[in-house]
Design a protein with these regions (language model features):
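Hydrophobic/aromatic residues within transmembrane alpha-helices
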Residues: 50, 115-116, 174, 194
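C-terminal long alpha-helix characteristic of the crotonase
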Residues: 124-125, 175-226
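Conserved CoA-thioester-binding segment of acyl-CoA-metabolizing enzymes
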Residues: 1-51
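Catalytic-core regions built around general acid/base machinery
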Residues: 35-38, 85-97
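Glycine-rich beta-to-alpha transition loops that act as phosphate-gripper elements at the mouths
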Residues: 103-109, 162-168
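CoA-thioester-processing core
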Residues: 109-161, 193
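Well-ordered beta-strand positions
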Residues: 121, 161, 165-167, 182
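Glycine- (often His-adjacent) and acidic-residue-rich active-site loop
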Residues: 5, 52-88
Length: 238
């Protein structure tokens, strides 16, 4: 069974994370890249939805157990490969010539929330799940690129509160501050609304992709030029 599945619903590509808490490690990053590449290779695809198979978690963020194991075994190349591969996932979402929609059907912690912020739009169910950045409590700073694209998705005043407090925020509050498009009643309603929204798009890839390239040019520059300053020496912990 794949940890990330790709399916088509008409012209909408649905990428489903299917590994429990969907903690992010090198295998996860490679699977996400492959799924996105395959989705975009299909010229009939007009939108992409990223969601989770589970009821409780969208993604619990970085696989800290895997990361500590890599550190303890001095497998630094794996750590670097993971971080660069996740940056590739983020850049593909930021530059995809079709809308990328996160259907957040459970907890989105840390890198899980960050992944959703790389998407163009977000929907989240209200009956279960929190959205938060616990990095301040686990002493793992954001990379510069992450800061840049999260700020496109979350108003500065709210991101300032969330990143410095680690506060857990539920869907209704996220909707109030325009971080998500809609707080949905449950998973069924979430997928119905996210898919209905995805189907409203049938834009030409050329102009849609060019708009995203121009919108996010500065973010891509930060990811490519500033992130390696922290990734190469693995200067990741505060």
């Amino acid at each position: 069974m794949s940890i990330v599945d790709l399916s088509l619903d008409g012209t909408v590509a649905v990428i489903t994370m299917d590994n429990g808490e969907n903690r992010q490690n090198l295998a996860f990053a490679r699977a996400m890249n492959k799924a996105i590449d395959n989705a975009l290779a299909d010229e009939s695809v007009t939108a992409m939805v990223i969601t989770s198979a589970g009821e409780k978690f969208f993604s619990a963020g970085v696989d800290l157990e895997w990361m500590m194991d890599r550190f303890s075994n001095n497998a630094t190349d794996d750590m670097r490969a993971f971080m660069y591969a996740m940056n590739d996932v983020f850049k593909k979402c930021l530059l995809a010539p079709v809308p990328v929609i996160a259907a957040i059907n459970g907890h989105a912690f840390g890198n899980g929330a960050i992944l959703s912020c790389a998407c163009d739009f977000r929907f989240m169910k209200s009956d279960r799940g929190f959205f938060c950045f616990p990095e301040v409590d686990v002493s793992i700073p954001f990379l510069p690129g992450m800061l840049a694209f999260v700020k496109k998705s979350i108003p500065h005043y709210k991101f300032n509160e969330m990143i410095l407090t680690g506060k857990r925020v539920a869907a209704p509050e996220l909707e109030e501050h325009h971080i998500i498009e809609k707080a949905c009643a449950d998973k069924e309603d979430l997928m119905a609304q996210a898919m209905a929204f995805a189907r409203t798009f049938n834009k030409k890839r050329g102009i849609f992709g060019e708009h995203k390239r121009r919108l996010h040019k500065h973010i891509i520059k930060i990811i490519d030029e500033q992130d390696p300053e922290f990734i190469e020496p693995l200067n990741l912990m505060a």
